[in-house]
Amino acid sequence: NEELESIWDSIEHSMDGDASHFWVAESDVVDALVRIALHRPQLPKSIDIAGRRRWSTQQTHHELQMLYDRTRAGSTGQFTASLLDQPASPKISVVPIDAAQQDMRPSLGALHNVLVECDGHGWQPTSPLRTAMMVYLAGKLND
């Protein structure tokens, strides 16, 4: 799939040591937006939506690479046990707390409060990032 190869190349070329992201699954975002649309609460001027956990570019790359390799192997019939014999993801390491090096997660307070007002449940993303990445890859392969 040329589009996936292009995305993959851009990820590999943009890997710098300090970049990080607070990924969240599309399904969790859609769920929050539908809850807001159904209940029509009073909204603040802006609402940030983000995942709870910080993912470095390297962790994201590692996870996508593993899933992509498995997907390609499965689609070509060349699936081996070695593709399943990988450590659990993500590769998490202890990072010293240094405000200069840490990206600040967007505040989820406004989103949480609006969702509590809607139905009492607040912001509770339920989809693991690995699942969201698999859905993304499947969609790209089916395009």
How should these model regions be labeled?
Residues 25, 82-85, 114:
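Helix N-cap / beta->alpha transition motif
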Residues 17-21, 48-52, 120:
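Conserved short-loop catalytic and cofactor-binding motifs
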Residues 32-103, 125-143:
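Mid/C-terminal beta-alpha module of Rossmann-like enzyme folds, strongest
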Residues 1-35, 64:
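NAD(P)-dependent short-chain dehydrogenase/reductase
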Residues 99-100, 117-120:
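Extended, small-residue-rich solenoid/repeat segments and analogous flexible loops
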Residues 104-115:
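Donor nucleotide-activated moiety binding/catalytic core segment of transferases
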Residues 106, 120-121:
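Catalytic cores of transferase enzymes with a strong primary signal for eukaryotic protein kinases
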Residues 25, 55-56, 107:
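A diffuse structural propensity rather than consistent per-protein peaks
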